[in-house]
């Protein structure tokens, strides 16, 4: 009768360890899927008034925050357009970005729009504000055509800060007229989020009265510290709601 020869336990452990190392070091090891975040918005998303928007804009800072905190499998794309609206009527508007989404296919979309909708003559955006809800809902529907499982965060616009340093009298008059519209849009966007089953992030309230975070002579666009703060608000929301995971 043939006897079954068993390998020594020590040899079995060595073989198991060798197999584990092979799996870890093998070029065929499956990597974590790269998830894509599209930051869609106007000049504040783009990083207006910054010296280096490619590294100082809120999407760029957000990317660094994710990486620093071990959220390593995320790729962020800045899709900010200066002066853009989500209103179809507006020129420019965010609708032209939809053509680029099929090539990126985002898993998460953060939309920050509304600032330019408050502009009246000569652009007449506010005169078409009754179209805002329908246009926003249609925009969300178009994103879902690209990825039905996309997690969408819609943000209210940043508050305008009339106490910002060195504002001209003309600028103060302009912002004083437009600022109540920002708060009206905050309510409208929150309602859209509920209707369309998206996430809602309030960016209006956190910037209320924060003159130290706004660009001098401007009052609408953040300064470098303001963009850092904006990125932290978005980061904290994504983490708290578990929209991003490790």
Where are these regions (language model features)?
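Bacterial Sec-dependent N-terminal signal peptides
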Residues: 1-34
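Local alpha-helix boundary/kink/capping signal
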Residues: 22-24, 65, 199
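Hydrophobic alpha-helical membrane context
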Residues: 25, 54, 235-237
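Residue-level detector of flexible, active-site-proximal loop/helix-junction positions
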Residues: 28, 44, 83, 159, ...
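Sec-dependent signal peptide cleavage junction
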Residues: 29-35, 181, 246
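Conserved SGNH/GDSL esterase-like catalytic core that processes O-acyl groups on lipids
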Residues: 34-39, 44-134, 221
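Alpha-helical cap/lid subdomain in secreted, periplasmic
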Residues: 72, 95-246
